[in-house]
């Protein structure tokens, strides 16, 4: 339950945009935050790594279902993570293209807005946006877009707008929030994985 400055009560069904799944001000979360305050006063890990950062990264690396070398980095916001994912994908592949989906929301920075798949309310009055960003329909039966339709749109994009050999990454939300809480069909995710593997595109 949340209370505003005028005393109105609200039930938070969104969990603070899905980051408060234990509830607002959960005692265990507050205790963990307080304990961390005793461990450091500066959290810029790129300047001086600290134990909590390194140990959490090592724990994630230990359980990540990836073979070979693994690295973990933490970021302050979702859009910061997205921007760094795009930079890493472009640096790793040597390619510049990125494909995103209609209805997607990836943040309010210029790159985040470029990747976002809705004009209103995020893109109105801004721009120009970073180049080499492409959008295709998100598979959503409620909007009349089947898995086959979305895959066909990707095929058309690769024939008409961008060679897949120029695409560094495809970014997708398995569950869209801003787009309407749409769940991506598993068959589409599997086909997307295969398509990315065929073309050397990161997903």
Task: Please state what every model-predicted region is.
Residues 9-95:
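Glycine-rich loop-to-alpha-helix module at the N-terminal edge of alpha/beta enzyme cores
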Residues 176-178:
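Alpha-helical transmembrane segments of integral membrane proteins
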Residues 58-169, 186:
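PLP-dependent aspartate aminotransferase-fold enzymes
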Residues 46, 147-148, 182:
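Flexible, glycine- and charge-enriched loops at secondary-structure boundaries
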Residues 1-11:
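Active-site and channel-lining beta-strand-loop segments
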């Amino acid at each position: 339950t949340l209370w505003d400055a005028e005393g109105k009560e609200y039930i938070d069904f969104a969990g603070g945009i899905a980051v408060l799944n234990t509830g607002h001000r959960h005692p265990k979360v507050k205790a963990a935050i307080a304990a961390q305050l005793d461990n450091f006063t500066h959290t810029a890990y790129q300047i001086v790594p600290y134990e909590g950062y390194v140990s959490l990264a090592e724990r994630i690396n230990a359980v990540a279902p990836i073979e070979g070398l693994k690295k973990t980095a933490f970021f302050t916001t979702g859009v910061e993570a997205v921007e760094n994912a795009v930079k890493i994908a472009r640096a790793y592949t040597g390619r510049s293209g990125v494909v995103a989906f209609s209805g997607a929301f990836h943040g309010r920075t210029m790159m985040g807005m470029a990747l976002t798949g809705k004009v209103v309310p995020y893109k109105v009055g801004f721009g120009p946006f970073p180049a080499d960003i492409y959008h295709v329909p998100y598979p959503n039966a409620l909007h009349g877009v089947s898995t086959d339709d979305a895959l066909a749109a990707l095929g058309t994009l690769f024939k008409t707008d961008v060679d897949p050999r120029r695409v560094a990454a495809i970014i997708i939300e398995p569950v869209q929030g801003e787009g309407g809480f749409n769940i991506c069909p598993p068959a589409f995710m599997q086909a997307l994985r295969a398509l990315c593997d065929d073309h050397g595109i990161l997903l």
